[in-house]
């Protein structure tokens, strides 16, 4: 089980990313716009740099929904490999069976 502080930190980052997503997209579009003047593009770069670090989606980390484990994460299920195996063996995940051949 991951520390509760780490799990809460990730949740806080997700909220921050969602809060600034539109503003970041607008600034990045201005920077990428070749028709904008150099001054406008430079101002947009400065504004983008002034945003909080945790507003960048690159800083997000996928974590297991049950334990908070950061490694061995399956996006389709939102669980780490350990908890996914446990839930599949209990029959809680429909349509998934243990492989045998």
Swiss-Prot record:
Q: Which InterPro entries match?
A: Ribosomal_uS14, Ribosomal_uS14_bac/plastid, Ribosomal_uS14_CS
Name the NCBIfam families on file.
Answer: PRK08881.1 (NF006477)
Any one GO CC term of this protein is: small ribosomal subunit
Answer whether the UniProt record assigns the keyword Chloroplast to this protein: no
| Any one GO molecular function term | structural constituent of ribosome
GO biological processes: translation
Question: Is this entry keyworded RNA-binding?
Answer: yes
The molecule here is called Small ribosomal subunit protein uS14
The subunit field of the Swiss-Prot or TrEMBL record says: Part of the 30S ribosomal subunit. Contacts proteins S3 and S10.
Please give the start and end residues of each transmembrane region. Answer: none
- What does this chain do? Binds 16S rRNA, required for the assembly of 30S particles and may also be responsible for determining the conformation of the 16S rRNA at the A site.
Q: Which family does it belong to?
A: Belongs to the universal ribosomal protein uS14 family.
Q: Which UniProt keywords apply?
A: Ribonucleoprotein, Ribosomal protein, RNA-binding, rRNA-binding
